[in-house]
Every structure is written in structure tokens, then in C-alpha cells.
């Protein structure tokens, strides 16, 4: 702009900084949320769906969900073919220590490779959209099948500190827009995709939250957290292995 400040810095100042208080002061909001999760999950095997990546945020949130908040999550992991051993070992250690059954969906590796190559060929900025869309689509599918009313999302401002550029927000965002992804594959993918699960912006943004009443929540924004504190807790409690920088548990995002 006229002051030499880039648009990304302005987006940070407008979208992130006003909300970033390190999760302080949300005790009553969190208590009410947890009470509602337990109430709506009464009489069911699970009271929430929990997507586990093996990264720091999801690992710490699972610790809180089970050990501190006494929730009964359906723990789900998508193996899109890019897992690094550190992620798989961290997932195993935490689930074993907490006595949780881990449900794994392994994607067709050749389909994932070809979809990823299609995004490279297209010169697309959101290169992780194929794996991210599979996460969204499978969890949308689980929400319909299990009947639970809450999905726990590990995103939090304290460790993310960024927002996606506004130019990425089309439909449900590239990762949530199955129509957009299918169209890109029609132009750039060299093989038919038959086993991959797609969702749509309508299903993800309208059907699931409003017609089925399933809420996706980000509880780590409601508790005081820092990267060092989360890491220390996980190392002491579960023998968690730190993996360096953000998203370095995954070969693609690393």
C-alpha cells in the first residue's frame, strides 16, 4: 500500500491480531461447550469426531480431550501416503497410552500421487489440496454415519498465527470445494480417480453444519497454549517425538 505494507501483513493485522489472546478468558465458554458435547453424545459410543495427524496441535488436543475433558472421541487418521515415521509413531504412542482405538483410512497411493502431480502441472498454489480435501470428505462422511454432533479441529491461532490469503477462499476454499478439484483433475490428471472420496462445498458448508447440526469447533483457541508447553507435556506424558517446524510431520507439507 502507500505505506509499503504488504497485503498479507494487513490481513494479519485485521484478521488475526484482534483475536489472538493466547486462549485466555474463555473458561465459561469452554465449560458450556464441553457440557453440550457430553450431553449430545449420551447413549452413543462416541461424543465427537477427532481427526488425528500426529502433529503437535492434534496430539495435544487429544490429550486434553480425553485426559482433561473426559470426552469419548472417535479417533480417525487419514493416511494419504505422505506420513513421515515420526507422525505414525506419535499417533501410536498417544492412542496406546490413552487406551483409544485408532481408525485409519488408507488412501489409494497411486491415485494420491497422480492427483498431486495434477496440482503441480496446473501450477496451483494450494498444493496440499488433494490430501486436505480427502480429510474433509472422509470426516464429512463419518459425521453422517456416526450421528455425533461435534467435530474437533486442532487449528489454533497461537501456533498457526497466519490466515490463508483471501484469494484462496473460493466456495468452501480450495480444499473443501470438490467441484473445483474435480474440474482441475479433468484437465491435468492422467488417470481416472475412482476410489477417492469427494465432498462438496454445499455438503461441507450447508448440509453438515445446518441440516445435520454438526458443529466443527477449535477448542485450542479457548485454552492458554504455547508450543513449548504443549511439547513438554506430550514428551513427558507419552514419549512424544518433536519433529521440528510446523507441519514437518508430513513429507508433502515439509
What are these regions (language model features)?
Residues 48-57:
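Short, glycine-rich nucleotide/cofactor-binding loops
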Amino acid at each position: 500500500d502507500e505505506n509499503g505494507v504488504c497485503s498479507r501483513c494487513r490481513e494479519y493485522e485485521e484478521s488475526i491480531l484482534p483475536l489472538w489472546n493466547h486462549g485466555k478468558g474463555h473458561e465459561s465458554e469452554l465449560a458450556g461447550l464441553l457440557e453440550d458435547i457430553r450431553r449430545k453424545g449420551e447413549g452413543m459410543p462416541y461424543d465427537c469426531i477427532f481427526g488425528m495427524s500426529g502433529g503437535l496441535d492434534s496430539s495435544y488436543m487429544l490429550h486434553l480431550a480425553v485426559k482433561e475433558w473426559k470426552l469419548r472421541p472417535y479417533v480417525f487418521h487419514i493416511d494419504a501416503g505422505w506420513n513421515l515415521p515420526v507422525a505414525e509413531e506419535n499417533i501410536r504412542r498417544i492412542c496406546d497410552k490413552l487406551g483409544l482405538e485408532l481408525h485409519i483410512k488408507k488412501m489409494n497411493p497411486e491415485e494420491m500421487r497422480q492427483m498431486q502431480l495434477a496440482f503441480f502441472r496446473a501450477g496451483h498454489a494450494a498444493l496440499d489440496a488433494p490430501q486436505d480435501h480427502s480429510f474433509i470428505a472422509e470426516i464429512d462422511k463419518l459425521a453422517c454415519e456416526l450421528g455425533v454432533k461435534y467435530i474437533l479441529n486442532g487449528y489454533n491461532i497461537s501456533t498457526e498465527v497466519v490466515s490463508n490469503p483471501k484469494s484462496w477462499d473460493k466456495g468452501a476454499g480450495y480444499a473443501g470445494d470438490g467441484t473445483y478439484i474435480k474440474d482441475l483433475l479433468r484437465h491435468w490428471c492422467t488417470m481416472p480417480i475412482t476410489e477417492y472420496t469427494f465432498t462438496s462445498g454445499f455438503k461441507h458448508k450447508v448440509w453438515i453444519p445446518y441440516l445435520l447440526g454438526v458443529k466443527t469447533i477449535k477448542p485450542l483457541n479457548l485454552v492458554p497454549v504455547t508450543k513449548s508447553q504443549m511439547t513438554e507435556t506430550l514428551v513427558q506424558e507419552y514419549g512424544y517425538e518433536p519433529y521440528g517446524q510446523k507441519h514437518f510431520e508430513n513429507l508433502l507439507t515439509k
